[in-house]
Amino acid sequence: MGYKDLKFDKDSVFLVTGGAGFIGSNLCEAILNLGYKVRCLDDLSTGNPKHVEMFEGNPNYTFIKGDIKDLDTCMKACEGVDYVLNQAAWGSVPRSIEMPIFYAQNNIVGTLNMMEAARQNGVKKFVYASSSSVYGDHPGLPKKEGIEGHVLSPYALTKKTDEEFGRLYKTLYGLDTYGMRYFNVFGRRQNPEGMYAAVIPKFLKLLLKDEAPTING
């Protein structure tokens, strides 16, 4: 089953946070291609406005520049929304080790703000970005939900905390939450540059230049 087989009410409204990012912009594009309304919320701190400029002029698309750390912004963005796809977060394990407080503010408080705004606005489903990093130091393969070790970075801890809040919001308030544990996602509009770039685009960039990638381990 592909995304084109998904069916929602014809007037459904989706809010994509971090919508100008790599994953978020692809979600915006897919939903617009299905004919549904999309609101893109992004503060453009890491998102690229060029990723979403192609949607300008589409009557089903609205861009909101705002920060999920601000609850009022989240509340307004969720008004009249049916589905939230929360992708807004700061990535990179190494950078989180350098900036643990900043990561907690963005990835935990920001996601909690979005869950609360979704709850108060009667959102039907709340899907958020978690990470494979929540499996921590558990050596078992393949990875399985419910079998996790100790997390190894502030970034992983923010995602594990998000999952706990997601579980509580479902149990206590009935918000239908789903966390997606991404494993090295790659695709269009991903940035292969910089010291914090993901491993797959880094490898591809080197291979395209006929250079050997370094594999640790």
Regions found by a protein language model. Give the residues of each.
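N-terminal Rossmann-like NAD(P)+-binding domain of SDR-like oxidoreductases, especially those catalyzing
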Residues: 1-185
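Residue-level signature of the cytosolic catalytic core of signaling kinases
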Residues: 57, 192-196
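A conserved pocket-lining segment of Rossmann-fold NAD(P)-dependent short-chain dehydrogenase/reductase
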Residues: 96, 146-148, 175-177, 181-191, ...
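Short, charged/polar low-complexity linear motifs in solvent-exposed/disordered segments
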Residues: 153-154, 196, 210-211
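Short, polar/charged, Gly/Pro-enriched helix-capping and turn/loop motifs at alpha-helix termini
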Residues: 110, 141, 192, 213-214
